[in-house]
Each structure stands twice: as structure tokens, then as C-alpha cells.
Curated annotation (Swiss-Prot):
The keyword rRNA-binding applies. It comes from Pseudoalteromonas translucida (strain TAC 125). Signal peptide: none annotated. This is Large ribosomal subunit protein bL25. This is one of the proteins that binds to the 5S RNA in the ribosome where it forms part of the central protuberance. GO terms for biological process: translation. Pfam families: Ribosomal_L25p (PF01386), Ribosomal_TL5_C (PF14693). Keywords: Ribonucleoprotein, Ribosomal protein, RNA-binding, rRNA-binding. Belongs to the bacterial ribosomal protein bL25 family. CTC subfamily. GO terms for molecular function: 5S rRNA binding; structural constituent of ribosome. GO terms for cellular component: cytosolic large ribosomal subunit. Part of the 50S ribosomal subunit; part of the 5S rRNA/L5/L18/L25 subcomplex. Contacts the 5S rRNA. Binds to the 5S rRNA independently of L5 and L18.
Length: 204
């Protein structure tokens, strides 16, 4: 569970639709929706500058986000973020309300440690996953999952089942069965630089 809190101010949005959303974006507002927890969906807006700053934090994508909406604090998680195809602008956000007594599905990043040790051995860690989909109660969401690669050698690999998840946290993929135990990484030996003779042979 994260010790950091993520709180953002939002305003209720009465006008919806493409035209209204376009006007809001011109005013540097980001249209968004809050849904879930057996309640009606609520249309809101956030300041674009706040969203741009928020997305710099890894926790914005994985942790509980408290939205202050019209005097009410609503606990949510981010479910979707839409961006402009070529401008550095966020165009829409989807938030899901959370219930402290119900498990949720979310994604947390993988932090790899010990890669410097592997590199000194002339090998490289090839990442095949950078995040894991998990199920847990809201308060148990970890900031990230750590994978230590320092003792791996060329030819080694790790799968989701090799990762030690925190107590109360389970893998969505593993719950689907053994066939969904995805590879997280493999370790490959670096190709040695060709000798002078090998380089000459290759040129002939």
C-alpha cells in the first residue's frame, strides 16, 4: 500500500457531448467521467495543467485517487486516459469509484533491480513485461512489484509465477490457469565483438 495520497480537484460537468468537450479543451479543461460502485456515472472536468503534472507520477496510474467533486470526496482509480494523437494534451479520463470492501482489478508496474550486476557479466535482461495485472482490496494496492535479477545468468527467465506478490495481492493472469503464466524477462548473452580476423572473413 502506498503511503502517498493523491488528491485532485474536479468540477461537475452539466454539458456533455463532442461539442461541449471540445469547448472545454479549448479552455484547458479535461472532460472526464466517474462510474462504478452501483452509482450513476458523473461527468466532471479537471484542469489540464493539474492532469499533466499528475501523470508524471507513477501512482496516478495505479493508486487510489481522491477526487474532490462539489464538496464531496470520491475515491477512485484511473481506468483510461486518452491523449491527443500528436499534441502533448490529455483529452479524456475515465475514473472508477472504489468500494473499500470489494476487490478490484488494476495494473502495477514492475521495478527491476540488479540489472547492473547482470550487465557486468556480459549479459542483458530483455524485458517482456513491465507491469502486472493484479486483484486486491483497494488499500492493499502496492506502489510497484520488485523483481531482483542480480543472480540470473544467460539463459535464465522469469515468469509471473516467480514474482513474490505482497500479502493479499494475486495475479489476474495466474488465476486464469497455468497457460497464462507469462514470461516477464529472459537473460541473453551479449554478442561479443568480432575479432580482426573474423571481421576480415566477413568482408570477403
Amino acid at each position: 500500500m502506498s503511503n502517498k495520497t493523491y488528491v485532485y480537484n474536479a468540477e461537475l460537468r452539466e454539458q456533455t457531448g463532442t461539442g461541449a468537450s471540445r469547448r472545454l479543451r479549448r479552455e484547458d479543461k479535461v472532460p472526464a467521467i466517474v462510474y462504478g460502485a452501483n452509482k450513476e456515472a458523473t461527468s466532471i472536468t479537471l484542469d489540464h495543467k493539474d492532469v499533466i503534472k499528475a501523470q508524471e507520477s507513477e501512482g496516478f496510474y495505479t493508486q487510489i485517487l481522491t477526487l474532490n467533486i462539489g464538496g464531496e470526496s470520491v475515491e477512485t482509480i484511473l481506468k483510461d486516459i486518452q491523449r491527443h494523437p500528436f499534441k502533448p494534451k490529455v483529452t479524456h479520463l475515465d475514473f472508477q469509484r472504489i468500494d473499500a470492501n470489494q476487490k478490484l482489478h488494476t495494473i502495477v508496474p514492475i521495478h527491476f533491480v540488479g540489472e547492473d550486476v547482470v550487465e557486468k557479466l556480459g549479459t542483458t535482461v530483455v524485458r517482456q513485461l513491465t507491469e502486472i495485472e493484479i486483484s486486491c482490496f483497494p488499500k492493499a494496492i502496492p506502489d510497484f512489484v520488485t523483481v531482483d535479477v542480480s543472480k540470473l545468468v544467460a539463459g535464465d527467465s522469469l515468469h509471473i509465477s516467480d514474482v513474490a506478490l505482497p500479502a493479499g495481492v494475486s495475479s489476474i493472469d495466474l488465476a486464469k490457469g497455468p497457460g497464462h503464466d507469462q514470461s516477464i524477462l529472459i537473460v541473453k548473452a551479449n554478442k561479443s565483438a568480432p575479432t580482426e580476423d573474423e571481421a576480415e572473413d566477413a568482408a570477403e
